[in-house]
């Protein structure tokens, strides 16, 4: 299973990730997010060791393409995650610059259709739909839909990350639906700080 821990903001967070089973880590470049990190700070705490262990994902919300590309270059991103209302043309333009691009899609009755609209993306992040919020809500959606999303992504040859409200207390309810990838932020935090105890608790349940 692919595991993305999102909202990484410090040297302390990186130290925890180095001991984890993460395959991807996410940096939030959306100024209105409580987990926002300035792009210039990322290079201060991202080590060569962690770059060998995980892929670096930048999360953007309605950021102009030229600005995304500038930040991606400065922070040496592997993946660009479009988490707002970016268009299929935006995704195409980013891919043309050589980046892996994921599109976040809210869970609703149109999600499967939207997966086809954004079929040029390399992957999807299926998240909860909360009015006027772009991810990081701590709210889970109805996971019985996960097999449909997984099946659609497999047919299109894409990664499919399940996000929204996943934590150590409920991940056992998600696992029977066999997600191929998960994206967790608040679920590995205590009082807004990444918590290694919660990381271990989640990973033990995944492995078992």
Curated annotation (Swiss-Prot):
<dbReference type="GO" id="GO:0004640">
    <property type="term" value="F:phosphoribosylanthranilate isomerase activity"/>
</dbReference>
<comment type="pathway">
    <text>Amino-acid biosynthesis; L-tryptophan biosynthesis; L-tryptophan from chorismate: step 3/5.</text>
</comment>
<keyword id="KW-0028">Amino-acid biosynthesis</keyword>
<dbReference type="InterPro" id="IPR011060">
    <property type="entry name" value="RibuloseP-bd_barrel"/>
</dbReference>
<protein>
    <recommendedName>
        <fullName>N-(5'-phosphoribosyl)anthranilate isomerase</fullName>
        <ecNumber>5.3.1.24</ecNumber>
    </recommendedName>
</protein>
<dbReference type="InterPro" id="IPR001240">
    <property type="entry name" value="PRAI_dom"/>
</dbReference>
<comment type="similarity">
    <text>Belongs to the TrpF family.</text>
</comment>
<dbReference type="Pfam" id="PF00697">
    <property type="entry name" value="PRAI"/>
</dbReference>
<keyword id="KW-0057">Aromatic amino acid biosynthesis</keyword>
<dbReference type="InterPro" id="IPR044643">
    <property type="entry name" value="TrpF_fam"/>
</dbReference>
<dbReference type="InterPro" id="IPR013785">
    <property type="entry name" value="Aldolase_TIM"/>
</dbReference>
<keyword id="KW-0413">Isomerase</keyword>
<keyword id="KW-0822">Tryptophan biosynthesis</keyword>
<dbReference type="GO" id="GO:0000162">
    <property type="term" value="P:L-tryptophan biosynthetic process"/>
</dbReference>
